[in-house]
Amino acid sequence: WAKELQFIAQAGLTYTKDLFDKERFERIREISAEIMSLQSKLPLSEIKDLFCNETGFQTPKLDTRAAIFKDNKILLVEENDGTWSMPGGWVDVMETVKSNTVKEVKEEAGLDVDAVRVIALHDRNLHNQPPYAYNVCKVFVLCKVKGGCFHPNIETVGSGYFSLDLSLIHISE
């Protein structure tokens, strides 16, 4: 409910023209940050950075992930913290789902790909713990490799194709 209060406050701040209502919506936003801080055990200042710096109508953040298959195995990249994930990341401003997926695969896996089609949408907070203070919609895109090869970089230290039974590796959330 803290996120719902944040959403209501953000929408109110976006559309109100009344100065008194603006003050009320700002207070609702502060209360939502205080609640989230208590629930999450994160410092209030960190929560305020997430909640109170947003402007405009609040929407979920968008993340793309590339589904790349070879010989009935899926490509994963090893992140700097030792966890593994499908190549991908936040959709940058001015990028489309397709262009962001292609860009992220090149950056993280060193591969040139064609983004073929969207194969799944995933609400991160419904399926992963702990929930984020904001909503994330993950878009999974089927990709075909055209070329390239992996080189360690600032985001990833390894890549490989893995059996679809992923129970043996530590997957990032």
Q: Which residue stretches match the model-derived regions?
A:
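Short amphipathic alpha-helical heptad-repeat segments
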Residues: W1-Q6
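Active-site-adjacent beta-strand/loop module that shapes the phosphate/pyrophosphate-binding cleft
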Residues: N72, R124-C149
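The catalytic Nudix box helix
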Residues: S85-A120, V141
